[in-house]
């Protein structure tokens, strides 16, 4: 047991450095090509001329597509081993390391050029890769899946500063690939990754800064639960739209570079209306949480961002949709809150409360992981007073979504790439 805890600690350290490496590579490319040192792609887009704002995501998609197509031609065959940690956990616990690194580099290109796709997917993949590489060298074969799971959880903890949610991500989303009794090493890896990440970044701040002064009462619980019902209906719709967009891009029968370039061009066109569509949505979420906009502004940014996410994910841009889903949930919750705020004197607090609820419940509706989704929002914002209400709402959202749409976003992703 002591040996496993020691290895879990090493995996956590490796994962933290893998995440930090990807993050610093992003910052370097943004500084080189966008003259942006703020770390915010929305700020970068705001400072660009309209034509550069239009073309940059398309050029990034084109470069990523050329890289992926070039690698396919170089290998002359599909890789025998997976390039995704979920696939690796469902098979024999092995990666195609070279192909996975190429995929991560392609993700780096599309993320730093403004595509509306999550950077955290590549971070978690690199963390799992680092764990797998270490495991194959120093541990027996039957433990490889466990250490990949530890790496994925640690990567999630370092990326989102949410070690408990990262651990439960393994238990809920990847349930069946490992025993719950093995969660001890997973939790150790996640916590160590968070601590090392804090040391690297010289900060232990929460991912999102929220000033929620409301004390949750009976009325608020009713509003939270009703938001869960709304998210349970919206989750399957979002998954259906993503699947339809992917099929639409595939039906065009474009070569990968042109398909990714088209997705990037759509993002560029949308960014002419609002630069908030650039990136994974982190900075937009923070600005909404700091000062919730008016209803029409939320609606406009929401529609543009939704189309940008659909274009990016549908075109096959390598990256995650976890953080974009958080923004979509926030916007849905805030739109609902703004509508209800007309009837209550404390409309601003209701809007913020239901925005946070929307983040958790839409995440639960798309991942079918209510406990992880609840803890994720609490850990990212520090608003643990919301935990009881969010847990009920997330369970409701997950049940409704699972009834209407059998597959979660991760099962849908695996089926799409199998």
Swiss-Prot record:
InterPro entries: Cl-channel_core, Cl-channel_volt-gated_ClcB, ClC, ClC-type_chloride_channel. Coiled coil: none annotated. It is found in: Cell inner membrane. CDD domains: Voltage_gated_ClC. GO terms for biological process: response to acidic pH. Keywords: Cell inner membrane, Cell membrane, Chloride, Chloride channel, Ion channel, Ion transport, Membrane, Transmembrane, Transmembrane helix, Transport, Voltage-gated channel. Belongs to the chloride channel (TC 2.A.49) family. ClcB subfamily. Probably acts as an electrical shunt for an outwardly-directed proton pump that is linked to amino acid decarboxylation, as part of the extreme acid resistance (XAR) response. This is Voltage-gated ClC-type chloride channel ClcB. It comes from Escherichia coli (strain SMS-3-5 / SECEC). The lineage of its organism: Bacteria, Pseudomonadati, Pseudomonadota, Gammaproteobacteria, Enterobacterales.
């Amino acid at each position: 047991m002591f040996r496993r805890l020691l290895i879990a600690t090493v995996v956590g350290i490796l994962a933290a450095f893998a995440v930090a490496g990807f993050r610093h590579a992003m910052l370097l490319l943004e500084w080189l090509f966008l003259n942006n040192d703020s770390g915010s792609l929305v700020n970068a887009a705001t400072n660009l001329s309209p034509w550069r704002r239009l073309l940059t995501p398309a050029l990034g998609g084109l470069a990523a597509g050329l890289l992926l197509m070039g690698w396919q031609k170089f290998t002359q065959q599909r890789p025998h081993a997976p390039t995704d940690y979920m696939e690796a956990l469902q098979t024999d616990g092995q990666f195609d390391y070279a192909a996975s690194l190429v995929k991560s580099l392609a993700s780096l290109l599309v993320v730093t050029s403004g595509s509306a796709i999550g950077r955290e997917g590549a971070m978690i993949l690199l963390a799992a890769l680092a764990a797998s590489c270490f495991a194959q060298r120093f541990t027996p074969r039957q433990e490889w899946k466990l250490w990949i799971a530890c790496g994925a959880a640690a990567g999630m903890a370092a990326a989102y500063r949410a070690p408990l949610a990262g651990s439960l991500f393994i238990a809920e989303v990847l349930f069946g690939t490992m025993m719950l009794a093995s969660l001890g090493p997973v939790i150790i890896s996640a916590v160590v990754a968070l601590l090392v990440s804090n040391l690297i970044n010289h900060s232990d701040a929460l991912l999102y800064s929220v000033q929620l002064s409301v004390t949750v009462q009976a009325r608020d619980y009713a509003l939270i639960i009703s938001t869960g019902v709304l998210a349970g209906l919206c989750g399957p719709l979002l998954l259906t739209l993503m699947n339809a967009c992917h099929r639409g891009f595939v039906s065009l029968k474009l070569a990968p570079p042109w398909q990714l370039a088209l997705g990037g061009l759509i993002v560029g066109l949308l960014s002419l209306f609002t630069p908030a569509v650039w990136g994974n949505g982190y900075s937009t979420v923070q600005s909404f949480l700091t000062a919730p906009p008016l209803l029409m502004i939320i609606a406009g940014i929401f529609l543009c961002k939704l189309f940008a996410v659909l274009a990016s994910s549908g075109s096959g841009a390598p990256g995650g949709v976890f953080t974009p889903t958080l923004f979509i949930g926030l916007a849905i919750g805030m739109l609902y809150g703004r509508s209800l705020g007309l009837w209550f004197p404390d409309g601003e607090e209701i809007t913020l409360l239901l925005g946070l609820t929307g983040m958790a419940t839409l995440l639960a509706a798309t991942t079918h992981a209510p406990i992880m989704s609840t803890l994720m929002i609490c850990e990212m914002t520090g608003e643990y007073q919301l935990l009881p209400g969010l847990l009920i709402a997330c369970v409701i959202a997950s049940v409704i979504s699972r009834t209407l749409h059998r597959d979660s976003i991760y099962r849908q992703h695996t089926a799409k790439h199998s």
